[in-house]
Amino acid sequence: MSSKFHTYDIEEMTPTEIYGEVLTQMGKAREEIVTLTADLAKSTKTKKFASELPERFFNVGIAEQNLFGIASGMALAGYLPFVSTFAVFASLRASEQIRTDICYQNLNCKIIATHSGLSFGQAGTTHHCTEDMAVMRSFANMTVIAPADGYEIANAVIASADYPGPVYIRIGRGFEKSVHRHHDYGYEIGKAVTLHEGSDVTVIACGTGVLHAEKAARILSENRGIKVKVIDMHTIKPLDQQAILNAIDETGKIITVENHSIIGGLGSAVAETIAESGKLCHLKRLGVPDSFSGVGHPEELQKYYSIDTEGIISAISEMVGETPEVDKETKVALNDDWKNVV
């Protein structure tokens, strides 16, 4: 992938700020790119684009349905709209406009949805978004991406500009740590990335779950000899089904991890692939259960719903026939700083 737009400092910028930087650099290079938001330029980090390319930045006010209607019109006029708002507003409040105005016409419109999953923890259920992947992947023509970190956000945004049709990219609030060491690891929309090889069990994760899965795999390998294959399934639709089929053949045990409801998201997509393959596979889905999410810091909520490192370790241990309780040695390893482990 071209490094032309990778001008950010991964150590100094949050993942969401990286999105804003990359989008601005792309806008300077491509006159057809426009950015739209609904009074959330500061929160979605599109303020830099607004400052440096004001003639191609459009703030429609707090009117998300109009936001996507306007974006569809601009796409029809030959522009390349990047639309930024909170995931909950894009996928729920404006779902009809995205479905009918954008997806039905298969318009070249890119949606960057921030504050997804449980990342806006203290704001509570009204601002959490654990349903967006389920909604968006049900729309015909829509591509759905859940990047793991700042590097992958940059790669996804850059790749989406040349990827035909509607694209939905969900990112967090912007405080997530990095899992990749650099941007040049062979990112491609629709192609999973294997981060860790293993023969006992496979963990397929997206978004914030990827770092936790990688940490869990390393801890279990070093402390208990459990070999875990970790797959970064950044693209939820189109899904890399071959990667799943290979994992079934290699381990026969799969755990999915997502900062999303277990209904309709990554876990459901993987389950559908397994069911249609006719292959035997032990599957467990980790995510938010069939309930509305609670209120708390994102880290607390991830722990509560067992989508943190400890929760993944427990699920892996149980699946391979060991006690799900995390022993003292493993707890010590959990306290280590595993930033940039890949």
Model regions and ranges:
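Thiamine diphosphate
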Residues: M1-R170, F175, G186, E329-V342, ...
